[in-house]
From Swiss-Prot:
GO biological process: creatine biosynthetic process; methylation
GO molecular function: guanidinoacetate N-methyltransferase activity
Complex formation: Monomer.
Main enzyme class: transferase
Domain RMT2 intervals: 1-234
UniProt-listed PANTHER family: GUANIDINOACETATE N-METHYLTRANSFERASE (PTHR32379:SF1)
Known EC number: 2.1.1.2
PROSITE patterns in the record: SAM_RMT2 (PS51559)
Catalysis performed (reactions): guanidinoacetate + S-adenosyl-L-methionine = creatine + S-adenosyl-L-homocysteine + H(+)
Protein name in the entry: Guanidinoacetate N-methyltransferase
Pathway(s) served: Amine and polyamine biosynthesis; creatine biosynthesis; creatine from L-arginine and glycine: step 2/2
GO cellular component terms given for this protein: cytoplasm; nucleus
SUPFAM superfamilies linked: S-adenosyl-L-methionine-dependent methyltransferases
Length: 234
């Protein structure tokens, strides 16, 4: 495998066809690919659990954007929450979500569509926790799609005292390969300015690090640490 092959080619955009594209879960259920893109891999589990723990830390009503392999979602369900709303746009993944929802301990509200379509229909001050982990759908938004959601919706949809956590591993893996060797510095320089623009306060943004060992064949992440943000709305 050529390590130099970028995840997105210049100008590439999958958005129009993503919802109909096959969700390719491998037989062992350790990898999910859509349109040949490495969307989710089972080795991410400890990190996904870290994000889920933050998102569910206030209890109440949790919104998750992106269902993937249900790694974070299943962890969210293990906490004493009340409702679990999940936005997912891919048909095959959404079918999995509907099936999974039937056996969960808390009320699950599956919402089908791109977050750009669904989020505007959701009310202000509605969620105690939000976990945003979706796959970038174009080269143009590869490094920035999370900020579009956070600025337009995350801040307004959180209740005061509510918590946001998120990741963009496809972006961060690239930044840590080519631009940064310090994950804290990467987060402070490339993420925090956008969070402040969205209306969050610097003193309400904290992060924790964890050691991780991505498999050598992983196409999107090779750094030995991951970072979990905790962002509280005042």
């Amino acid at each position: 495998m050529s390590a130099a092959q970028p995840i997105f080619s210049k100008g590439e955009n999958c958005k129009q066809v993503w919802h109909d594209a096959n969700a390719d879960y491998n037989a062992a259920d350790t990898h999910l690919e859509i349109m040949g893109k490495p969307v989710m891999e089972r080795w991410e589990t400890p990190y996904m659990h870290s994000l889920a723990t933050v998102a569910a830390s206030k209890g109440g009503r949790v919104l998750e954007i992106g269902f993937g392999m249900a790694i974070a979602a299943t962890k969210v369900e293990s906490f004493p929450i009340e409702e679990h709303w999940i936005i997912e746009c891919n048909d095959g993944v959404f079918q999995r979500l509907q099936e999974w929802a039937k056996s969960q301990p808390h009320k699950v509200v599956p919402l089908k569509g791109l977050w750009e379509e669904v989020a505007p229909t959701l009310p202000d001050n509605h969620f105690d926790g939000i976990l945003y982990d979706t796959y970038p759908l174009s080269e143009e938004t590869w490094h920035t799609h999370q900020f579009n959601f956070i600025k337009a919706h995350a801040h307004r949809m959180l209740k005061p005292g509510g918590v946001l956590t998120y990741c963009n591993l496809t972006s961060w893996g690239e930044l840590l390969k080519n631009k940064y060797d310090n994950i804290d510095k990467m987060f402070q320089e490339t993420q925090v300015p956008h969070l402040l623009e969205a209306g969050f306060k610097k003193e309400k943004i904290s992060t924790t690090l964890m050691d991780i060992s991505p498999p050598s064949e992983c196409k999107y992440y090779s750094f030995n640490k991951m970072i979990t943000p905790t962002i509280i709305k005042e």
